[in-house]
Structures are given as C-alpha cells and as structure tokens.
A protein has these predicted regions:
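Helical element adjacent to the flavin cofactor pocket in flavoenzyme catalytic cores
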Residues: 142-154, 173-232
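Dinucleotide-binding Rossmann-like beta1-alpha1 core, especially the glycine-rich loop
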Residues: 38-162
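Gly/Ala-rich phosphate-binding loop of Rossmann-like dinucleotide-binding domains
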Residues: 11, 15-16, 201-203
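Glycine-rich FAD pyrophosphate-binding loop
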Residues: 15-36
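Residue-level detector of anion-binding/catalytic polar loops
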Residues: 20, 157, 208
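Glycine-rich Rossmann-fold phosphate-binding loop(s) that bind the pyrophosphate
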Residues: 2-4, 26
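N-terminal Rossmann-fold NAD(P) dinucleotide-binding loop
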Residues: 7-8
C-alpha cells in the first residue's frame, strides 16, 4: 500500500486489529494530494459526480490539467468503456439511488476521524463548524436549494443564512455574496498535520515503512498473493 491517506489509514486499523503491517511507498511520503488538499469532511456532498450536466462539463474539463475531471488523453479501450458507462449514469435516477450510500460513507468517515481524535492517541486539528455554500445570484441559490432539499430529506441539518448572518458567523472574512446555506454536518482538518502525526503514531505502534520503494508485482500461491515484489527485492 502507498503512504497517502488511504494507505496510512488502512495501516492504522490493521495494526489496531493486531496485524503486522509494512507500508511501501515509491517516494518519501512528504508530498502529494494527501498533504495539501482542503481537509474537508463533507457529509453534505451527497451528489455523485455522475449527474445530469456532467457530460458537457466533463468534455470541457477533461483536457484541462487543472480541472477536477482531468484525464490524460489517450486511446484506451478501458477508459473509453468507463466513459460510456459514466455518460449512461448521468441521470436523475442514478443521483437519487446514490445519495443515501454516499451520505452513509461520508458520515462514517467523519465518525472515524472523531474517534481517532477522542482516543487521545493521535493529536491533530479537527473542527466541526459546518460548511457554508455561498451564492451571489438567484440562479445559484435555486441550484443549491435543490441539493439542500435532498440533504434535508436524508436527515441533514441545513440552514439558509442572509449576508448579515454569514458576516456574524465569519466576521473576519467579508464576502461579496447574497447569502449562503450552512450545512451543520461538515468538518475540516489540516491534512499536513494529520499525515505527519499519523505517520509518527504508526511508527510508535511498530508499523514498518519501506520508502523510495516501488512495487513491481506479486508472487502468488494457489491464486492468492503470497508476497509483494519490489524494485529492491
């Protein structure tokens, strides 16, 4: 497994269950998206990426390296097959089927972070102050109102705030907005601090790390993985 947030979190829970764990990473575990993302824990983000309108946006974004939907252009049958399936999934029916599952995963993820912090074994920044989704125009307000209705239907607490209420909540961050929706469920952390302290905690618990090591394959016995092959043996 790699040394990003997924790899280290997996190592954390495996060692808690009594397993001997070795984390293999091709770098030095000092960079990448796990260290520099926004750190949001967002139960409010219940709408799947495959949603109505994403096909048109996707075509505009997929060739832009700075977009959230960038893909390196290439002729790849698996990528083309995935793209066709993605297009077929961009329907209102798919959105409605997916939201409950996405919410449950997001809430469970937030719960695990809270449990990590409350255990006292891992010191990291975590605030549960919610998330403001601000808007400037009536059109943007109506678009977000649709998501708000879905979120409330799934049990999330969402409040609509005018500019004065937003300013009272964020007095040191003046905003050129008409208002905002506040999702009470959301939280945020500081990824760089979390990753650093999680790495230290894993070392203290006996997890081994093989850095600057690339996984090149696997050895199998009876169709099961018996060993990992790396560029160092």
């Amino acid at each position: 497994m790699g040394g990003g947030i997924v790899g280290l979190s997996t190592a954390y829970y495996l060692q808690k269950e009594g397993h001997q764990v070795v984390v293999v990473d091709q770098g030095a575990m000092d960079g990448g998206a796990s260290h520099v993302n926004a750190g949001y824990l967002t139960p409010s983000h219940i709408v799947p990426m495959a949603a109505p309108g994403m096909v048109a946006k996707g075509f505009r974004w997929m060739f832009n390296a700075s977009s959230p939907f960038y893909m390196k252009p290439r002729w790849d049958k698996d990528l083309i097959s995935w793209g066709l399936k993605f297009m077929k999934s961009c329907t209102p029916e798919h959105v409605q089927r997916s939201m409950q599952a996405i919410l449950e995963i997001n809430l469970f993820s937030k719960q695990l972070y809270l449990e990590m912090q409350q255990s006292g074994a891992l010191d990291f920044h975590l605030e549960t102050k919610g998330l403001l989704m601000a808007y400037q125009t009536t059109h943007a307000e109506k678009e977000e109102a649709e998501v708000v209705a879905w979120a409330r239907g799934l049990g999330l607490t969402v409040k609509q705030l005018d500019l004065a209420a937003v300013s009272a909540m964020q007095p040191k961050a003046p905003m050129n907005i008409a208002g905002a929706y506040w999702y009470e469920s959301d939280a945020h952390s500081t990824p760089e601090i979390f990753m650093k302290n999680l790495h230290t905690e894993l070392q203290n618990q006996g997890v081994a790390f093989m850095l600057e090591t690339e996984v090149t394959g696997f050895q199998k016995t009876n169709k099961q993985i018996a060993a990992v092959v790396t560029n160092k043996g």
